[in-house]
């Protein structure tokens, strides 16, 4: 009987462990990597999903609605921890000169038709801890509408630009 109970306990523990591992995180960590002008670029972010909120992720004035009801004109451009950019060489992003290094990316979405990429020198922050005094600078992004709704937020690097797409929005900026 003792042996049977022990086997049952091991089986239950294994089953619980397996079922706990089957639930993916709500906003999984993602990495976009690429080379532009021979310089390696990596963007690390967490990718939220639209999850049935199409048309309700962004308000009419461009502010993102958060789960706890707050609205932020400066967005971490992802979920959870702040989005980071690393490069092994000096870049020009839009009209902003960015020396080699690691930075935090934010996006000013206060105007729904004209987003602005913010490159911030302070790294290791939670996404809502924006400090404008640490900005390296800002540059305008080119807005477009994706061909289809983008369920999972995605950053891409290639074709001489960095692009952010989510829901019915896409914004890109040239890099060289």
Regions found by a protein language model. Name each.
Residues 21-99, 104-176:
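Targeting-peptide/extracellular-domain and disordered-appendage signature
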């Amino acid at each position: 009987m003792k042996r049977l109970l022990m086997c049952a306990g091991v089986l239950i523990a294994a089953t619980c462990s397996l079922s706990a591992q089957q639930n993916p995180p709500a906003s999984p960590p993602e990495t976009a990597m690429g080379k532009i002008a021979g310089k390696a670029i990596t963007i690390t972010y967490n990718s939220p999903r639209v999850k049935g909120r199409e048309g309700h992720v962004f308000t009419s004035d461009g502010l993102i609605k958060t789960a706890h009801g707050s609205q932020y004109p400066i967005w971490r451009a992802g979920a959870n921890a702040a989005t980071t950019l690393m490069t092994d060489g000096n870049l020009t992003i839009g009209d902003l000169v960015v020396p080699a290094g690691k930075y935090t990316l934010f996006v000013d979405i206060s105007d729904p038709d004209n987003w602005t990429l913010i490159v911030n020198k302070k790294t290791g922050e939670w996404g809502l801890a924006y400090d404008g005094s640490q900005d390296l600078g800002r540059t305008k992004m080119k807005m477009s509408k994706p061909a289809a709704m983008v369920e999972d937020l995605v950053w891409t690097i290639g074709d001489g630009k960095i692009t952010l797409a989510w829901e019915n929005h896409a914004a890109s900026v040239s890099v060289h």
